[in-house]
């Protein structure tokens, strides 16, 4: 098995050719020569005639990246049930890979620096390999990466910056291509039995589809409800829709963004944010301060009047408690629209002029019908002007 693995990896295996016997062309032995042959020892370096590179490519269809409550800020869990690798071997016999353990180091091709290593655990695999000739077997291995921790290549400020930049590039690019270096430990079924191929090396380009700054598709505010407040803020529940255009399911914990209407007028927090691939409907909590400035009051008046208001949702330094995500999250800028209130607060109003109105005083009788679409708002009094 070791010789087979080293052969595939284009490594030299020191072997010794040992003389055993001599047979002449007529089939008879030559005892006088055999004794000399038996003591013959020849060192023979055993190596493939050229590099094989058995793993030709890795395709990531779907990936999961999760920061749990106790995760290392630079060591999230990675997993996938949709990985595949194209394999080609210079052997003409059937092979079926039944499980793999993969260690993958993601490398930035621009500076050739390692970014992070995925220390894979043993995971099942399925194989579609075909013997295409007497000296060629090729096909696809479908891999599963069970939850495995990522780790930095070294504990240094430079290594942490590389990982931060990797996540920032993923956040803002359409496709993030990197070099995937590593080794695979494969348990394979062959005509001669089950064989463990230990340490099959590979180096291929692969990548992830990026988040594109979450601006590829509109971020929608689907509904707003007042659920409480203080002297400083009105507390809102916000129903929102965010589209994830990448091929990565993300779990990034509590996330807070600023609500900007020319000035900062509040904040929006998405607890335990998970962005799955495609469209996500999320519940957020917002603290809105209408007294932040004239813009805050204008925004409130527009909302109550049924007018849409264009806002910007912006990241900042404290958008996340996860240190490695701070550079990416603080640069997020997402445009959205707060739809105006669809329900008219004043449903109807009537004025009755009394016999004394305008004679003894200016008092008239009014009746107003109000609607309250908010969960935690109670009307205590109404002040109005009639013209």
Provide a role label for each language-model segment.
Residues 1, 117-156, 262-295:
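Intrinsically disordered, low-complexity Pro/Gly/Ser/Thr-rich segments with frequent PxxP/GP/PP motifs
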Residues 1-26, 144-185, 287-321:
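Eukaryote-biased detector of low-complexity, proline/serine/threonine-rich segments
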Residues 29-52, 195-213, 325-343:
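Short beta-strand elements
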Residues 51-72, 210-227, 337-358:
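Low-complexity, acidic Ser/Thr/Pro/Gly-rich terminal tails and inter-domain linkers that flank the onset
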Residues 77-89, 232-243, 360-371:
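Short beta-strand elements of extracellular/lumenal beta-sandwich folds
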Residues 91-99, 246-252, 374-379:
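A short beta-turn/strand-edge loop motif at beta-sheet boundaries
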Residues 92, 106, 248, 257-261:
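Extended serine/threonine-enriched, polar tracts that run as long, contiguous segments within proteins
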Residues 380-387:
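Conserved small/polar residues in nucleotide/adenosyl-binding loops
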